[in-house]
């Protein structure tokens, strides 16, 4: 994938550039990202995880081909060139099938890889770090690498079969915490050691060699590591460059390799920039974008309550709360404490489990109702100032239209702007 290999080449030549990956399937988040990339004339990397999207539909109900169609249709409607769009698959492996015996889980993983590659995803994260039902815990580096090499072989064959050439790029390794934010309260986080990173790389190099895949090594562009960034429900562990110095220096010995950092959500702009400078040059962001979406919607719901008689209001927040209580499976095992603590977490937690509920038809109807209510007449400027102060400044300067949709999109783009700036390079 030329955009990514070129980015890595420039980074290794000293440009201190990077790329961020938008990890969300929400249409408004994706619209915000596509419009932002379009305005700034940059390529856009959008990733789906093995939980969201798989050959059986994942929790979004979309297969990889569906997801690609959905994103490409959106890009076309916004006149964004498809050759500037990069699709990635995240944590692809037996992740969804850990409760099955390894043989069965890996057979499913083979099909998962085939479905992603056949659909045109070009950035493939091979992650076989999780133990299956009959596996030891934890798995050895060698077993993890052997399974990843097996999936790489499937990917290469599928790519050649469908596109006539193998032009995939790969990411290997995994961060220590669970994807999507930690379940527990955090205070300190272990940074991946250079020795552990080297062991992962060497195990993979050896396993790829055994599968006859040595030639693809330059297309393994990134190793996922833990640079010491994470968030839980109410706290963020900020990047501390000093703790990652040895890890950062270690990757300088590899000609075509950078690091990929997961869970970079909610880091300060300064930390994001420093991560890229320190070679953690692929920054994954997901929950922070849907968190910004949720913030904008809660603000608009508060404006609606000021302007619209109670009986005509959308009641978005109450509808959301009711649906989350009726279907607690996406938050129950994550949010703890008494009733009030869990209520606050449902609405405001950094881990943003509410993102799983936006596709619900009742919530979607309430959202549409909210937008209709506020689109009928101009939103008074003092209310925008009160509830969306960052957007108010842009409305007053004439650079932003004060419609519900534009206010939401712009609020999400404030987060994207931090990532764009971090990745620009010198």
Swiss-Prot record:
Transmembrane segments: none
Coiled-coil zones: none
Top-level lineage group: Bacteria
InterPro entries in the cross-refs: Aldolase_TIM, GatZ/KbaZ-like, GatZ_KbaZ_carbometab, TagBP_ald_KbaZ
Entry GO CC: plasma membrane
Pfam families the record matches: GatZ_KbaZ-like (PF08013)
GO terms, biological process: carbohydrate metabolic process; D-tagatose 6-phosphate catabolic process; phosphoenolpyruvate-dependent sugar phosphotransferase system
Functional pathway: Carbohydrate metabolism; D-tagatose 6-phosphate degradation; D-glyceraldehyde 3-phosphate and glycerone phosphate from D-tagatose 6-phosphate: step 2/2
Subunit structure: Forms a complex with KbaY.
PANTHER family tied to this protein: D-TAGATOSE-1,6-BISPHOSPHATE ALDOLASE SUBUNIT KBAZ, N-ACETYLGALACTOSAMINE PERMEASE II COMPONENT-RELATED
HAMAP family, A to Z: Tagatose_aldol_KbaZ
General function of this protein: Component of the tagatose-1,6-bisphosphate aldolase KbaYZ that is required for full activity and stability of the Y subunit. Could have a chaperone-like function for the proper and stable folding of KbaY. When expressed alone, KbaZ does not show any aldolase activity.
NCBIfam families: agaZ_gatZ (TIGR02810), PRK15458.1 (NF012002)
Family note: Belongs to the GatZ/KbaZ family. KbaZ subfamily.
Name of the protein in its database record: D-tagatose-1,6-bisphosphate aldolase subunit KbaZ
Species for this entry: Escherichia coli O17:K52:H18 (strain UMN026 / ExPEC)
Gene from which this protein is expressed: kbaZ
